[in-house]
Amino acid sequence: MSAAGTGKKVFIKTFGCQMNEYDSDKMADVLRAAEGYEPTTDVEQADLILFNTCSVREKAQEKVFSDLGRVKHLKARGVKIGVGGCVASQEGAALIERAPYVDVVFGPQTLHRLPEMLARRDAQQRPQVDISFPEIEKFDHLPPARVDGATAFVSIMEGCSKYCSYCVVPYTRGEEVSRPFDDVLTEVASLADQGVKEVTLLGQNVNGYRGRMGDTAEIADFALLLEYVAEIPGIARIRYTTSHPNEFSQRLIDVYARVPQLVNHLHLPVQHGSDRILSAMKRGYTSLEYKSSIRKLRAIRPDISLSTDFIVGFPGETDDDHARTMKLIEDVGFDHSFSFIYSARPGTPAAALHDDAPRELKLARLQQVQEAIEANGRRIGQSRVGTVQRILVEGPSRRPELNAGHELMGRTECNRIVNFAGPARLTGQLIDVTITEAYPHSLRGEVLLRERSPQPA
């Protein structure tokens, strides 16, 4: 039953990963359907303020409490405040003790209960906390998504069962639970019917997907799911994130040869180049095994773009360990990375490890990692100049100085942003552009005129 037209507004601030972005969209959908809330980007106009949090790094966690303090004054006019996501899951009722003006605390698996929690808050006149792990229940209680554009996220699983020594995800999101195979396909088909051309399949470890097929006992793995998603009419591109190298199997690699909709880009977190550190992280593979997987993939897709994650300054990291990370970067040729200094998370095994490396050394190592990968990115970007790239046009350029000139932006298969001049009617379309310039984090192109088309690269 729709509750549209109430005039109530919700402000949602999202921290962290794409899973959180997806969850924030679902919070908005749930609140719109149940209570008529409409999203706002102006916190001062909100009747409800939600922070969807991340606890992967200490800085992100502390920023949540800083932001809470900044909106506390809005309670005077009856605004409700909620905290969801991984910090909420980790802190639970302790969050209320630290910020007693918070009305609701909910975990990633209980966001669908938001309307009920808010109602109980009013009825009982006390804060509500629900950070339970009701497996995949939330997907059965979410209203249909409202599509805005030609791209969409689709969550295919929740949680992680890898228990890396530094990571809180298994404790904040629970162990791996896969959505039923048919449920995922139904959602993707619905999105395609609404004009979506590109889907990004989400999970903490998507290649660990094991979804039940219909009413049978059969289980679909991630490779099979990709093949079925590719058969859905209208889906031109498939992305996924995040993966774990342990389950980047030959069966999954072979899908790249059979499914052209699978984009020419892979994000595969390696975290470190030293086998000694990888073992301490409990990652379960060696740098050689990681490179072997990449070599097999490049035998099928020679020009695939690769991005990754690196943790610098893990307890006990030596100069030799760091040198091995730099060698891995050189050997693999990553296009992009998310690189951070290690941040001890309470309750994880790594938090008990002795860490005596000075922060200045860690910062220097981080800079070396980032500079090496940025150099790779610049080289790869320059190599695209003069080539033809197919891009999916997402909308106006995000660079303010270009918007006055009616600039648009889109992404290549390799996830490079391309800015170009063109009419707004191209939004949502797949078009060919000739790349004319390369910048550190984007490309510039011209819409290809068919009558004078160069050969695609």
From Swiss-Prot:
Domain TRAM: 382-449
Class of enzymatic activity (EC top level): transferase
Annotated keywords: 4Fe-4S, Cytoplasm, Iron, Iron-sulfur, Metal-binding, S-adenosyl-L-methionine, Transferase, tRNA processing
GO cellular component term of the entry, any: cytosol
Cofactor(s) this protein requires: [4Fe-4S] cluster
Residues in Radical SAM core domain copies: 146-379
Gene3D superfamilies in alphabetical order: Methylthiotransferase, N-terminal domain, tm_1862 like domain
Keyword tRNA processing: yes
Membrane-crossing residue ranges in chain numbering: none
Keyword hit for Transport: no
Function: Catalyzes the methylthiolation of N6-(dimethylallyl)adenosine (i(6)A), leading to the formation of 2-methylthio-N6-(dimethylallyl)adenosine (ms(2)i(6)A) at position 37 in tRNAs that read codons beginning with uridine.
Subunit (UniProt): Monomer.
Family of this protein: Belongs to the methylthiotransferase family. MiaB subfamily.
Protein name: tRNA-2-methylthio-N(6)-dimethylallyladenosine synthase
Species this chain originates from: Methylibium petroleiphilum (strain ATCC BAA-1232 / LMG 22953 / PM1)
Gene for this chain: miaB
